Amino acid sequence: MISAMLALLMSVTAVSGMSVSGVRAQTNEEKAREIVADMTLEEKIGQKLMLSFRSGWTMRDGTSVSAVTTINDEIYDIIGTYDIGSVILFAANFDPDATVNVELTDGLQRAAMDESLGKNAIPLMLGADQEGGIVYRLTGGTALPGNMALGASGDTDNAVMAGEIIGSELSAVGVNANFAPDADVNNNANNPVIGLRSFSSDPQIAAEFTSAYIAGVQKQNVATTAKHFPGHGNVSTDSHTGLPSIDSTKEELYETELVPFQAAIDAGTDMIMTAHIQFPNIVTEQLYSSLQDEWMSPPATMSREILTDLLRGEMGFDGVIVTDSMTMDGVANYFDVNERNLLAVKAGVDILDIPFNDMSSWADMESKLIPLIDAFVQAYTEEDGYQGITLSQDELDESVVRILTMKFNRGIMDLAEDERTLEEKKAVAEEVVGSVVNRESERLLSANAVTVVKNENDLLPLKLDEHSRVLFASTYSRNNNRFVLAWERAKQAGLIPEGADYKILQHYNWTGLPDQVNSAINSDGTNFYGTNQDLLDWCTVLVHASEISSASNIDGYRVTCPQLFINYCEGLGKDTVAISLNQPYDVQAFSEADAIVAVYGTTSAGLDITESFGGGTISANAAFSPNLTAGVEVILGTFGASGKLPVDIPRYISGTGTYSDEIVYPLGHGLSYDSLVPDPDKQALQTAIEQAEALDLSEFTEASVTAAKEALAAMNEALADAQNTMLTHKLAQSVVDESTNTLNERMDALMELLVYDTDKSALSAAIDDAMALQEEDYTENTWAAFAQALADAKAVLEANVDQEQVDAALQALKDAQAALTLRGSEAPEDPQPSEGGENKPDDTETGAATGMGLLAAAFLASAAGVLCLNRRRRTH
């Protein structure tokens, strides 16, 4: 009864927020309000500023660095003195070595929490645009295939997985906020800035994947940001370089653009990022542009109707509103620095992302930061405000409460209580960032996205033989190693027969058939010299990648050159495969190809391949675009094909740079086939790994451990390879078996050298006592069992075994000795036959002897294995 009442009390407490003692715990919002009540005006303003330091730094003494990857004293003082609330980090701030990134974020947080510089000492929100795909910042992390690729996979679990990987790596280096996911609906095929960053042109698909991505990132307690509100997908101008305008009505926005944002709000996104886009059919406000000397419809970032009335009022968002960079031309061309930031706050913005151009010196603090803070103070305190712009202190308080509530929600406010050392934080980063498990997950996600648009005569997956000669071709040399990686992985999967060969062609401009190759390499890494036609005549299969970022690219050499080469090979009866490497709208350009594949992404980052292609496929310091490699793996049959187009493919109007309304391939189109690689049996490998991982060096003598140093290093190397093999997808059984055998052999070699540090004194004494007994004093059966136990004990005494086996031998010997029966003390025979059968003389003794015999037999089996077991660590 009492336990039932306690359970009821606990349930009521959970619902009401009351502790068992009856004192209600403070909510995060209440904690935030308590802090805000004690903050100065300048401290509150500081919380609304997000600075960047991506352009290097020049110190007051004239020394400079080209990239801020570690904190310096001047940045430290600025962060702490002006109570800066947030810092955004870019690729220029991230070192390929994750431990260096930890030093930077740790230093930034120490500056923010330095009580000698400010009494509130509020930790920073440290953010980055780690979307995945073509937008990622961690140069040593896992790039992932990107949103459109995730949408093509058709499985929202893939978005959750991608979000978890991204969140884990950001958290590991001390970044607590991600400016992702991109929730834009890519309903304009010629969008110059969103494209692959969007999950789909279908609002519902985009909404489902947006919510899933948010869930994944937040599992790692990293804040999320749905962007770019109220939608950047239907533009033909990049707001980085201009001010786009969308003529949609509010009803049309609700039908399309707002669907993913409402889903993000419902999923609990921490932040929403604004778009520098005009919506003249929705916004009735007019702002005066001081730089253009005209009245204009404000971009969404500066529209109170968009941010306060629509986003907060109608859609119910109560989280943090953050701007896109306030240095982008979409706002910077129309308003001066102070104006545009104050107007954004007046519209309802909480955090100003990069309010002025990147800070790169102490002078920037004096010429940019201080004047902006002064302008805010003026706008909040003076009747006429700053240049006529007035701001509400009540709204400021509510804004800072939202910011601090988010910081509480994501554990940022708890950083002062983090007792981990810097070295402990670095160890986490080394383990997580760019880990094998993350990159193998990235590989699987990328393969799941690959979409086979055409597959004439079931050419794919390619069935290579010893005479196959594959020519891989693309526009950029950065793709060369991606082709190599896919080939080597297929080889490890057992798909490349002896004699099959490949070459790689790179053409970085228009080049004709008889022209000398721009650049080409043979499979052994040497350069190929000759013409394009020489290569095309050599191959039996052409796999050519095309790459467009806008409609007009379809008329350029990046498409027309692949068309020329494909058509030439088709004329000779060769097999041809076209790969759409970037935005998928060029899949329509290769009607002559036997097969067409879309992979949804590429970046300029190179790829460093190590000698180990299974598991440790990439150097530890390289993030790279995985899409092309995944596409070739699907083409070669390492993975099956399952992706579907997440966007409609409208027909391109040649020479115009535009698309028509005709759909060539509809959203959802995609052909499927199975992998050519059966899943290997990894059970023996798993067992070998478990045995190696269970090895406890403290059980062995110090001298033997020292003597076995080289063998131990060799075993650990084999163990790491085995662990990678265990995680690696699509390997041939022979590769798995080789890894298993290598680990077992090195484990055996190590165990030959290690000597167990055991106490055998009790066993030795027991043996001495047992040796004093005489066989003629005991019954034959019990003596036989005792003699066997004694022999086993002697074997263990001389063998290199662990303490558990020593103790077991001692106990077996004691048990056998206790079971000895003196001659003449046997139970008398029963002269009468027992009911149901013949009388069995010495039945009791026989039973006892049988029991001891079983015990002896069991230990005999154990002892017989001593010489084997002492070479292999027992498995707990």
Regions found by a protein language model. Give the residues of each.
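Short, hydrophobic alpha-helical membrane anchors of single-pass surface/secreted proteins
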Residues: I2, T846-A858
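Sec-dependent signal peptide cleavage junction
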Residues: V12-T27, K840-G851
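Preference for extracellular/luminal or secreted protein segments
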Residues: A25-D77, D83, G313, Y334-Q691, ...
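Second-shell residues forming the walls of enzyme active-site clefts
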Residues: A37-T40, T63-S66, I71-E74, P96-N120, ...
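Hydrophobic faces of well-ordered beta-strands that scaffold small-molecule active sites
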Residues: G46-F53, G85-L89, L124-Q130, A177-P181, ...
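Short glycine-enriched loops at secondary-structure junctions
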Residues: R54-S55, L126-V135, N176-N186, A226-H232, ...
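Catalytic domains of carbohydrate-active enzymes, especially glycoside hydrolases
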Residues: D73-F90, E164-N178
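C-terminal membrane-anchoring or membrane-association module
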Residues: L860-H876
